[in-house]
């Protein structure tokens, strides 16, 4: 058991006991690849790590020993092509099983990796590559993805290798062909290539309300922060299958498909579906006898539209959700059908689970739960004072300078000013608003900023507005969230047209297709409204809140 190497105490009698006494050891040179993956392989060469399947009948089961050997081969290959500590790689791999092998190899080398979604466009890819100094891209063999990468190549400054995990194309290396003749042994570096806990391990690009996506940095200690996520919220079990539904390009993947789960000895289940259907997901749960399960609220809503009673879901002992608030209606209906309540969790790309419905207290449908013990979470009012019970305030994490929480991001890559603005005061503001009841439960009110959460995706208005405004028919636009009963929120565009253009269904379709071509397709506005003028402040800023308020009252 590896967990007891990092937790002085694993079992707790109550939430109060957990909050007060939970601690995690953070070795100076902790590296997830060596200290978790390779150590599990050393303890038990037959211990399962991953069960993977796809829609085409493909199935792969890997032990930690197999991942150790494959990742060593990959690390030796990557080193042979010039990658080293501090190099940067971009990965567009969906849920291919090779992702786990590749990131393990990159961690062993100290190569910073950037997980990315396959829906990125040429513009998205070029921006990410140049902003982070990417030297290698590895993708799935998908016509769209390959086409976007190849189109972006002339605009990327440092790329010297592009590869595929499941195919052959001119100009691309085949991952399997390249690594097969390399040694399956790789010695942990003890020279200037050695990694330390405070070194940058991973970067996520995350959308904000202004500017281009920010580069959120996590260091090598970050996986240890996810012990709380996996052990005490997901409730994973050693040797049992855990399923979180997430593309490898999203932070949710790190929450539920690798770090905390493997530290706890759980087996990751990955269903690499080309297109989500609720019936297929329910069938996978039944077929593989999943023990613990986590998906966004939208997926629970879709599954409830199926005949859930048709499926044997009795293997699942714990259901969880995160990404957006979950209504009491869904929680109650799910309990009626399965006998289990869904435990909510709350957090950000910048951290691990921050607030959750932990096992020591009753679940209250609609609540976020209570704070994780590794964060000093408070609610602050407009005056910067801690809120009383029942008073709304912004969720903040205190003491991030004097007592940095393990798992919290360490800054924005190559941007000292943004890092100082976010963390320099010692208080990290999540820009989310909530209130606390008399029993300590937090209840989500809404986002302070304008980021849209649609079906688990985070969508920044600036990127969509920039794309939309490139169309000649558009003078200016505002992107906001509109309520949706299935997705929670959908993207809405409020548009002021240029002279000579008139509103029509055909123009709406044209604008939607225009956005799909310029940015990731999931960001396109499902609702388009034409107006004579956009609401603005005296200073000329668009008042998106006014649009949202008007939509909520319709």
Stretch-by-stretch model annotation:
Residues 45-48, 163-164, 169-170, 180-205, ...:
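Conserved pre-ATP/AMP-binding loop-to-beta segment of ANL
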Residues 46, 50-104, 121-126, 174-180, ...:
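Conserved AMP-binding/adenylate-forming core of the ANL superfamily
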Residues 60-65, 194, 201-225:
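Conserved AMP-binding A3 loop
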Residues 104, 108-180, 289, 499:
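Structural core segment of the AMP-binding/adenylate-forming
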Residues 120, 127, 137-142, 293, ...:
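AMP-binding/adenylate-forming catalytic core of the ANL superfamily
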Residues 224-241, 248-291, 306:
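Conserved AMP-binding/adenylation subdomain of ANL enzymes
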Residues 263, 290-294, 304-364, 376:
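Gly/Ser/Thr-rich phosphate-binding loop
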Residues 374, 385-421, 459:
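Conserved ATP/PPi-binding loop(s) of AMP-dependent carboxylate-activating enzymes
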């Amino acid at each position: 058991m590896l967990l007891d190497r990092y937790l002085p105490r694993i079992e707790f009698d109550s939430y109060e006991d957990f909050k007060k006494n939970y601690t995690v050891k953070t070795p100076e040179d902790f590296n997830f690849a060596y200290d978790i993956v390779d150590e599990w392989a050393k303890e038990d060469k037959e211990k399962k790590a991953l069960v993977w399947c796809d829609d085409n009948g493909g199935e792969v089961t890997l032990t930690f020993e197999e991942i150790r050997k494959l990742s060593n081969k990959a690390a030796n290959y990557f080193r042979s092509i010039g990658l080293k500590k501090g190099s940067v790689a971009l990965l567009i791999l969906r849920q291919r099983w090779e992702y786990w092998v590749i990131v393990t190899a990159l961690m062993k080398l100290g190569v910073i990796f950037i997980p990315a979604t396959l829906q990125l466009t040429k513009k998205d890819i070029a921006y990410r590559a140049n902003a982070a100094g990417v030297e290698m891209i590895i993708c799935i063999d998908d016509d769209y993805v390959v086409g976007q990468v190849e189109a972006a190549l002339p605009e990327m400054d440092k790329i010297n290798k592009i590869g595929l995990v499941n195919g052959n194309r001119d100009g691309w290396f085949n991952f399997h062909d390249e690594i097969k003749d390399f040694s399956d042994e790789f010695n942990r570096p003890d020279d200037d290539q050695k990694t330390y806990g405070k070194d940058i391990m991973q970067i996520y690009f995350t959308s904000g309300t202004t500017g281009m996506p920010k580069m959120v940095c996590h260091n090598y200690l970050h996986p240890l922060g996810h012990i709380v996520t996996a052990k005490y919220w997901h409730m994973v079990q050693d040797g049992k299958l855990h399923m979180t539904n997430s593309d490898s390009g999203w932070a949710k993947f790190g929450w539920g498909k690798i770090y905390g789960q493997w530290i706890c000895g759980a087996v990751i289940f990955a269903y690499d579906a080309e297109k989500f259907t609720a019936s297929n997901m329910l069938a996978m749960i039944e077929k593989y006898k999943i023990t613990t399960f986590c998906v966004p609220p939208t997926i629970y809503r879709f599954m409830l539209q199926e005949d859930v009673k048709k499926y044997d879901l009795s293997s699942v002992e714990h259901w969880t959700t995160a990404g957006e608030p979950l209504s009491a209606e869904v929680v109650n209906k799910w309990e009626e059908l399965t006998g289990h309540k869904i435990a909510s969790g709350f957090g950000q790309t910048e951290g691990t689970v921050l607030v959750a419905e932990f096992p020591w207290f009753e679940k209250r449908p609609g609540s976020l739960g209570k704070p994780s013990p590794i964060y000093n979470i408070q609610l602050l009012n407009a005056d910067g004072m801690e809120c009383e019970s029942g008073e709304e305030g912004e969720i903040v994490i205190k003491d991030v300078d004097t007592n940095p929480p393990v798992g919290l991001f360490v800054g924005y890559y190559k941007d000292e000013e943004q890092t100082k603005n976010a963390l320099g005061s010692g208080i990290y503001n999540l820009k989310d608003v909530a209130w606390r009841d008399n029993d300590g439960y937090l209840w989500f009110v809404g986002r302070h900023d304008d980021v849209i959460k649609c079906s688990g995706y985070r969508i920044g208005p600036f990127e969509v507005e920039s794309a939309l405004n490139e169309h000649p028919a558009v003078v200016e636009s505002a992107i906001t969230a509109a309520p949706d009963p299935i997705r929670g929120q959908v993207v809405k565009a409020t548009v002021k047209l240029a002279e000579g253009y008139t509103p029509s269904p055909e123009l709406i379709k044209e604008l939607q297709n225009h956005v799909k071509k310029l940015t990731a397709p999931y960001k396109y506005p499902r609702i388009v409204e034409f107006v004579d003028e956009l609401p603005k402040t005296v200073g000329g800023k668009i008042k998106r809140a006014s649009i949202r308020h008007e939509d909520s009252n319709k």
